Amino acid sequence: MIVLNNIALFNGHADHFCGDACVAFTDGHIIYAGPREGSPSLDDGAQVIDGHGHFVMPGMVESHAHLSYTNNGPLELDKSPVEEVVIKTIHNARVMLGSGFTSAISFGSVHRVDAFLKRGIECGDVLGPRLLAGGRDIGSTGSNADLHPDYAQLKIDGLGMITDGPWEVRKAVRTLSKNGVDVVKVMIDGELISSGGGIKPGVLGFTDEELAVLVGEAHHRGMRVACHARSAAAVKQAVKAGVDFIGHANYLDDEALALLEENRDRVFVGPAVAWEITFLEHYQSFGFETGSPEHEGYAAELEATQASVKRMREAGIRVLVGGDYGLNITPHGTYAKELQYFTDYFGFSPGEALQAATKHGGEAFMPDGSLGTLEAGKIADMVIVKGNPLEQIGVLQDADAIAAVIKEGQIYTGLLDNQSPHQKNAEQLNQLLGARPCN
């Protein structure tokens, strides 16, 4: 048994905070998390760590992950050699874990990298978050997954699987299942920035029949389905087909909101606004002018997203943290910016943003409820922070403030600065926290 004593505790519920607390865990699971007064008696041989006032919270869940994206531009995602992608993906996984994200739901992978990354993490060869592995995006001809014009004949297919018709869709899902994928990603509508004649938001890439076949085949094979859906039409098609994770949902009409509310016990929505926000900061570097359709379009999209998230929160729909990190303007390692966006743009309190990243993310990752909060019986995933995110959510963006990360009872430090060894025992963590006390 390991006991973290003398800590400030946030257990994953938005309204919970305990300033004089302890957490006890063994065999990768929580035994107790709460006030020091009333904590269980220690077993012989229990290892006690003095937390020196550090803030302890559940490990976070990145719910829109692209670990195999290598900080390229949005139209360059499949241009790197697969060998280079693998090397960078291993680095990205370590950075994500070191940033306090102990779990990740993939929203798409280049090539088959995610599935092999998951195997490497599970067998201990790679340091990274537990992963629901994604595969190549499934899209129709002319969709946001169909990046290359016919005349180019580039023979590059590392990002998308282009399918038309129910049987092509079904075969693509079966191929992903064969490759070890957990989450099938489908492009339901388009993007304001698309190569060539790619479809835009609001234009559906698949018929109702095609999408129903995709979801049905995925669920039949034990996989879940994530989608890119910006428009109300795309959200409605996704919910009706049974999609599990909806990415973006920027524009909602009354019917789309009603469908989401009716299915709020099974469906999760992640607005993933990092792209829009950073594009509006850097659009000129992409060659766009102020007032261009793309600039005005993303500004309107961000404003619409704020209204949509407000309505979803009022309807009790779980809104998740995760934001298309892995692009050149949203690089790996900046994942915690998303919590800041939740407070700045969506009106979340810091506690509500933390709950979205922990409790609700855990419910999305593991529907059985075993992940995302620090309560007896739950998986022992924790982040030890020098500072109080409930007072200043931005502290989670400071690499120096992440004192340690605990994933399923294993303690890690130094993942962001290449210190070695990364894994620590209780005595080493006790020494580390004592060297940088918070009280």
Give the location of each predicted region.
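Metal-associated gating/positioning segment near the N- to mid-region
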Residues: 54-125, 141-145, 209, 241
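His/Asp/Glu-enriched, well-ordered alpha-helical/loop segment
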Residues: 220, 290-293, 302-388
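Active-site core of metal-dependent hydrolases
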Residues: 188-303, 320, 325-327, 346-348, ...
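Histidine-centered divalent metal-coordination motifs
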Residues: 52-54, 64-68, 219, 228, ...
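Active-site mouth loops of central-metabolism enzymes
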Residues: 74-87, 148-171, 203, 224-226
